[in-house]
A protein has these predicted regions:
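Alpha-helical elements of Rossmann-like donor-binding domains used by nucleotide-donor carbohydrate transfer enzymes
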Residues: 3-4, 31, 35, 39, ...
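Alpha-helical scaffold elements within enzyme catalytic domains, especially in hydrolases
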Residues: 7-10, 65, 164
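Alpha-helical cap/lid subdomain in secreted, periplasmic
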Residues: 89-105, 109, 114, 118-193
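C-terminal catalytic histidine-bearing segment of alpha/beta-hydrolase fold enzymes
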Residues: 2-47
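N-terminal secretory targeting modules
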Residues: 46-77, 81-104, 129-134, 193
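Glycine-/small-residue-rich active-site loops that bind phosphorylated ligands and cofactors
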Residues: 24-25, 82-83, 114-115, 143
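Short glycine-centered, acidic/aromatic-flanked micro-motifs in structured strand/loop junctions
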Residues: 1, 76-79, 140
Length: 193
């Protein structure tokens, strides 16, 4: 495989070796095809241009907890994008691979059709009563648009979640995700975010 990979890279191709024990050479027999799908997606033309990340801090607190204490609690608060199998599962698997000796508790608090305002009201019951997250992921953008709350209420909902989280655990790392869906695309094309 090494020779084929080197030759393909020399021709300008992208190669990533994904070891899957017990499935021989048949990719359709993989228990989890996410690494293959992720590789294909990451290597699409203009993929990097479409990635928008605004980093406002770090994930140092949760990293140190996972790496040194070998325990970690990670919560996922969001709508159907969070509830269904997808990004949440990929992050859970990635964390388990990065920190194989860490015992994780994952709080899956995705409920379809809910945005930041409902999240603010359910954060205590659906997340904090199940554990104190070291790392919190919050997703709401698509349902914020469809729930009918104006941008002020959406902002207040998200700020309420963040303030509540910071009040109960100032060391909690927080990642806010804002996915898009079809009605957002014309706005993005016009440069409106």
């Amino acid at each position: 495989m090494k020779i084929a990979a080197e030759r393909y890279r020399a021709l300008g191709g992208n190669v990533e070796i994904i070891l899957k024990p017990g499935c021989d050479h048949h990719p359709h027999s993989l228990d989890n095809a996410e690494p293959v799908v992720d590789f294909i997606i990451r290597n699409q033309p203009d993929y990097q241009k479409k990635q928008v990340i605004h980093q406002r801090g770090s994930l140092t607190n949760s990293y140190l907890k996972f790496a040194k204490e070998k325990k970690g609690c990670v919560a996922f608060l969001g709508g159907s994008i969070t509830e269904m199998r997808g990004w949440r599962n990929m992050i859970q698997e990635d964390l388990k691979q990065r920190f194989p000796k860490t015992e994780f508790t994952f709080i899956d608090a995705g409920i379809p059709s809910t945005g930041s305002t409902p999240h603010a009201f359910r954060f205590e019951n659906d997340v904090l009563q199940k554990g104190m997250p070291d790392l919190l992921f919050v997703e709401a953008a698509v349902n914020d648009d469809t729930n009918g709350f104006d941008y002020i209420r959406q902002t207040r909902g998200m700020e309420g979640i963040i303030r509540h989280a910071r009040t109960v655990s100032p060391e909690m790392d927080i990642v806010m995700l804002h996915f898009i869906y079809d009605p957002f695309i014309p706005l993005l094309d016009k440069g409106i975010q």
